[in-house]
């Protein structure tokens, strides 16, 4: 889908060279398209095959030629075919009509649900918000998830890195965040699937429908728009699909004045696609073979994710770390932009602690007294020091048993185990698996609950009472129920 075009639109050029997804197109003198303009190629090749694709101008070569990168396969494309300058960048549909739908990089619906119910479109290339428009006062974004709100709080309009292997609960955590922002903040979400498996994209769509995040019967009640450029697609599509998703999110922020969640899975694949395109365009590679423009490519995307005085885009980005090397230029460049990291731990998942967020490895720049307040800061640090001490004592416990510990250490272990259990929480989107109603816990309730555990006020309650509950009052009610059952 391409926006209404200016006067330069409609200029016709001729394809002079095709190398994989890269094409060189010759235009009449003085009629060259601008960088990032979309070129449309439609027609039949000499073999009689239908060809239809969009390409994006990347370089001006001289001799009235431009070099463009195709957004879909170039099979059947031949020299001499006609390319038309649309006069504008690739543009995607925006607004309420995008909710519940799946789009490709060009904003075309790919879910077989018919045309999109919106006439508004927006170009995927835009400047980041002006510094005068930004909300400069840091504000905590409450998620209703205890472990995140207490130990690694998200910044409204900030960027969060989500680290975790397969099967530790990334998708369920993403679904819960989408559900909570819709219910508590009245906001919507946009999901950008960048260079990941098609099967995962399909599974996510089906899970969204099951959990009610997408309402298949009435799409207008859906809470998320999906934008996919999967790993079987050309690098041009994978490089630009993140911008397509971001453009949809910007409309909800700037026009609807909403708080928006933007999920990008996976931000590394965005860099990887940029690296492939850079090599195809003949640029000299830099460190580890990445593109020389790595910093500006990542910055152009990340700087548009911001909180303005009108609304905010809070971005949660899954980060793949190649060969677990955090010094690799791709994750290292991404880290510079992140405000918080949420690390999912397989050991916690195997214990049945869900969400399996690691309370010691997850970090946030928001966790400082000037932002969250003294009480929140003190409680979070006390929880972390208690869990750290428990971690240090585990070797001794494994070898000698609990009885060999001092009275103080035994008390610490007892409270740490209760804290660990209390960090678990039933999710709304997991109700269909667990049979437990989901819980949204306010930040003040979370802080009060952990303070009571650490102060020893709940030492007499059984550990089981702290597992998979919402606030501390539910712990007390569950303890009474357990006591009644054991009589």
Curated annotation (Swiss-Prot):
Topology in membrane: Peripheral membrane protein
Pfam families named among the record's database cross-references: ATP-synt_ab, ATP-synt_ab_N, ATP-synt_VA_C
A GO cellular-component term linked to this record: plasma membrane-derived thylakoid membrane
A GO molecular-function descriptor: ATP binding
Kinase as UniProt keyword: no
Catalysed reaction, written as an equation: ATP + H2O + 4 H(+)(in) = ADP + phosphate + 5 H(+)(out)
Alphabetic keyword roster: ATP synthesis, ATP-binding, CF(1), Hydrogen ion transport, Ion transport, Membrane, Nucleotide-binding, Thylakoid, Translocase, Transport
Record EC number: 7.1.2.2
Subcellular location, record wording: Cellular thylakoid membrane
InterPro entries: AAA+_ATPase, ATP-synt_VA_C, ATP_synth_F1_bsu, ATPase_a/bsu_AS, ATPase_alpha/beta_chains, ATPase_F1/V1/A1_a/bsu_N, ATPase_F1/V1/A1_a/bsu_N_sf, ATPase_F1/V1/A1_a/bsu_nucl-bd
Positions annotated to bind ATP: 164-171
Function, as annotated: Produces ATP from ADP in the presence of a proton gradient across the membrane. The catalytic sites are hosted primarily by the beta subunits.
Family from the record: Belongs to the ATPase alpha/beta chains family.
Protein name: ATP synthase subunit beta
Source organism: Synechococcus sp. (strain CC9605)
Lineage of the species this protein comes from: Bacteria, Bacillati, Cyanobacteriota, Cyanophyceae, Synechococcales
Gene encoding the protein: atpD
């Amino acid at each position: 889908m391409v926006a209404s075009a200016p006067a330069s639109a409609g200029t016709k050029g001729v394809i002079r060279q095709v190398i994989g997804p890269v094409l060189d197109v010759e235009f009449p003198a003085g009629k060259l398209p601008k960088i990032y303009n979309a070129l449309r190629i439609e027609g039949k090749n000499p073999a009689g095959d239908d060809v239809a694709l969009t390409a994006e101008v990347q370089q001006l070569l001289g001799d009235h030629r431009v070099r463009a990168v195709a957004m879909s396969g170039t099979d059947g494309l031949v020299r001499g075919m006609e390319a038309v300058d649309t006069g504008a960048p690739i543009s995607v549909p925006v607004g309420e009509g995008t909710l519940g739908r799946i789009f490709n990089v060009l904003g075309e619906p790919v879910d077989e649900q018919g045309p999109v119910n919106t006439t508004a479109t927006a170009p995927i290339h835009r400047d980041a918000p002006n510094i005068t428009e930004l909300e400069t006062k840091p504000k905590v974004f409450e998620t209703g998830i205890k472990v995140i709100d207490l130990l690694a709080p998200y910044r409204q309009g900030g960027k969060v890195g989500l680290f975790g292997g397969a099967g530790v609960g990334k998708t369920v955590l993403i679904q819960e965040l989408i559900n909570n922002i819709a219910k508590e903040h009245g906001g919507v979400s946009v999901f950008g699937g960048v260079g990941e498996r098609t099967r995962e994209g399909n599974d996510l769509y089906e899970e969204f429908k099951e959990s009610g995040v997408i309402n298949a019967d009435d799409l207008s009640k859906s809470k998320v728009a999906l934008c996919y450029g999967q790993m079987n697609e050309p690098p041009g599509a994978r490089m630009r699909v993140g911008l397509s998703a971001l453009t949809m999110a910007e409309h909800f922020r700037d026009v609807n004045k909403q708080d928006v969640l933007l999920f990008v899975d996976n931000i590394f694949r965005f860099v990887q696609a940029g690296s492939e395109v850079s090599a195809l365009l003949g640029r000299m590679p830099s460190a580890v073979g990445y593109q020389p423009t790595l910093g500006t490519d990542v910055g152009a995307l990340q700087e548009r994710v911001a909180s303005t005085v009108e609304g905010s885009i809070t971005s949660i980005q899954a980060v793949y770390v190649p060969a677990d090397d955090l010094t690799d230029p791709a994750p290292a460049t991404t880290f510079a932009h992140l405000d918080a990291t949420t690390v999912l731990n397989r050991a916690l998942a195997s214990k049945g602690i869900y969400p399996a967020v690691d309370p010691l490895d997850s970090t946030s720049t928001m966790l400082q007294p000037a932002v969250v307040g003294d009480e929140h800061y003190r409680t979070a640090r006390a929880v972390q020091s208690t869990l750290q001490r428990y971690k240090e004592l585990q070797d001794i416990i494994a070898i000698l048993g609990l009885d060999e510990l001092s009275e103080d250490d035994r008390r610490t272990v007892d409270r740490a185990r209760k804290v660990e259990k209390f960090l678990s929480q039933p999710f709304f989107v997991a109700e269909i698996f667990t049979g437990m109603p989901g819980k949204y816990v306010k930040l003040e309730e979370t802080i009060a609950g952990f303070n009571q555990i650490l102060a020893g006020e709940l030492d007499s309650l059984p550990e089981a009472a702290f597992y998979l509950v919402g606030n501390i009052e539910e712990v007390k009610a569950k303890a009474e129920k357990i006591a009644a059952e054991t009589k």
